[in-house]
Structures are given as C-alpha cells and as structure tokens.
C-alpha cells in the first residue's frame, strides 16, 4: 500500500495594490496539508481529501476593500493538467481544485487553472479557503510514501 501525502509551503508575494480608502500592509498565509491516506490501487473509485489555506492581512483605513489572490504552482509535475506525487521513480497522479465538484483546477490562472480571489476589508481582514484534492483510481505505483510540494503565492 502507498501512503501519499502533500506538503504545503507558503510563499508570500508582495504585489501591493488596493483602494484609496483601505490599504493592506502585509499578509500571512498558512496551510494544512492534503493527506490522501493509504492508497489502494484495486479500488475503482477516486480518492478524495481536503485541506485549508488561511490568509490574515493587516488592513488600515476605515473603509474600502482590497483584492487578494491565492495561486498554487504545479509542484513536481510542471503542469496543471495532472499533478504528481513522487517516491523515487514512482509517481501517483492527483490534482487540487477550488470546488467540491472537482472541476476547477487550482493553479496560477494559466492553462486549465484558476486562482482563488477574495476581498479583505478593515472589518474582515482574514479568510480561509478549502483546497479539494482528488487522486484518480486504478493507478499502479510501487509501495512507499509519495509526496509533492506546492508553493502558495498570495498577492495583494
């Protein structure tokens, strides 16, 4: 049996934009990993999991709102079409999605991918977003622990 896990690392991009009334001076990002558990290659249904990305910003000003964008990179696969978790030369395909229907690939807005967009205000400077993970059925990897690292970029 394979034990796939997905590690997260947050990267903060300081691309400052905003309205004249509210200003984001900084944001912090944290994320929980998407752990698929033990993968059984004989099961004919996909494996699902989820995680969370949380963003907390320092917003000054009495009114207004600022757009925040969360983007993911491709990880080890180099493509948003299908990400891969690796164990030496073996791999497991998976992907990350914005929606529970698993139709909107979470990425950087290029190719088949979309980004997560949210507004922050002085009254609501923080938010969390669910990351939906799906691993297709009937893959035949070797045994071991499979991992991938996704860089999370928060732009404001």
For each feature predicted by the language model, list its residue ranges.
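Bacterial N-terminal signal peptides that target proteins for export
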Residues: 1-9
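Intrinsic disorder/low-complexity segments enriched in polar/charged and small flexible residues
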Residues: 10-11, 108
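N-terminal signal peptide c-region/cleavage motif recognized by signal peptidases
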Residues: 17-19
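N-terminal small/polar-rich segments of proteins
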Residues: 21-88, 116-156
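Extracellular beta-sheet repeat scaffolds used for adhesion and glycan interaction
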Residues: 101-124
